[in-house]
A protein has these predicted regions:
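Structural motif
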Residues: 66-68, 93, 103
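A short hydrophobic beta-strand segment most commonly corresponding to one strand
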Residues: 41, 87, 102-114
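Short beta-strand segments in beta-sandwich/barrel cores
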Residues: 48-50, 65-71, 85
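Conserved short histidine dyad/triad with adjacent acidic residue
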Residues: 24-27, 37-54, 90-91
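A short, N-terminal "cap"/entry segment at the start of jelly-roll beta-barrel domains
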Residues: 1-35
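Asparagine-centered strand-capping/turn motif at beta-strand->loop junctions
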Residues: 98-99
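Short, conserved beta-strand element in jelly-roll/cupin
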Residues: 40-44, 54-69
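Short acidic-glycine-tyrosine-enriched beta hairpin
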Residues: 74-90
Length: 114
């Protein structure tokens, strides 16, 4: 077991993300987790992530605020509020945007590639 406190985690720059701060809470280097990692993303108003797809599974869980998931052309946007979550399967594309004027905080769980 390894406890992690918010004070000890360090921010990192998530690729293709903007106007946000990412914190890695658990992972190989942080706690020895071998199959997945967990992070916390703080999105400023109009912050988000560019459209991207990867072969990894993702779970997003909104703690505070609101984020909009944009699955791509012709697909309906999905808005997540506090305590809402979404599973994004391998190779499913998505963009993320905080369309509000309030910050949003989201937990992120992603598996490591095999």
């Amino acid at each position: 077991m390894k406890k992690v406190t918010l004070q000890e985690v360090k921010p990192y720059q998530a690729p293709k993300h903007f106007n946000m701060v990412a914190l890695r809470l658990h992972g190989k280097e942080e706690t020895g987790a071998q199959r997945f990692w967990m992070g916390m993303s703080h999105f400023l108003p109009q912050g988000g992530a560019e459209y991207d797809a990867s072969p990894l599974e993702k779970i997003y869980f909104v703690l505070e605020g609101e984020v909009t998931i944009q699955p791509g052309p012709g697909k309906e946007e999905i808005t997540l509020g506090p305590w809402d979550s979404i599973y994004i399967g391998p190779n499913e594309g998505r963009a993320i945007i905080n369309k509000t004027n309030r910050p949003a905080t989201m937990l992120v769980v992603i598996n490591y590639p095999d």
